[in-house]
Amino acid sequence: MKSVKFLLPLLLLCAVLFCGCTGKEEKKIDEVVKRELDLLKHLDSDTTQKYISYQEIFPGDLEDAAMSSDIEEVFSLFFQDFDYKILDTSVNRNKAIAKVSLRLFTLDARALAEDFSKALLKHEIALAASDDTEDDQTVTLEDRYMLLNQLLSSNKYQTVERNCSITLTASEKNEETIWEIKRTTTLENDLVGGLMNYLSDPDILSPEDTLLVYLDTLKNMSTEELANYLNADSIVSTEDPNKISLANALVEQVHNIFNYSIGETSVSGYHASVKADITTFDSEAILN
């Protein structure tokens, strides 16, 4: 009985000491996370690039472009309303690993990705309608960030919440435990509100939205742009000025009366069919 009475205070003391050490370590870990995420809140460019590479936002683009002020501005605009809240911190001292659960507050990345996909499609159509055939019509990484910049500058996106976890690893330096955030693709995607996943989603736009962007872009082209896009010169394939005038007149006719309405959509696997009524000139009547 005396042994039990002696052991109980000892065990209680050990438990208190362990909890105290663990609490101290959790506080240190929280401070590391706060320090890094506060730099994102304060639009620190170096910290942004540490966790979110501007090239990895568009992983399919292999272009190695220099980090420009325009690209930096995109991240500044994106993170201007960024915030976070630490929910829980757990430490595994044996494995020198810690995990911090967070709630992130970011702009609505899905809405931004939808707008970007529409803007990119318009940009690609505009390139095809350009009369400067010597220019490379490939969409560059800088073009993509230019579009993001325009969207973030001209639109106000809602703030959304997202839960995520951050893993930290420990190392010993001068008999002191140093905690460091482990950079992962998942963390990168979480910090930008899922933007990386949304931008790579081929279904981010519905079939009808895709067709709507396409037809609306055609409808709003100038006569010259429409002629370039339709390759009007190939309609007559001749130097005859009368036939060239006819081709130009046809393009002018399309430009004046072109209209559309979109109907039902059916989707089967990777294929979609969208019904649309197109208003244009009566080609049969002209040819006859």
What are these regions (language model features)?
Residues 1-8:
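Bacterial N-terminal signal peptides that target proteins for export
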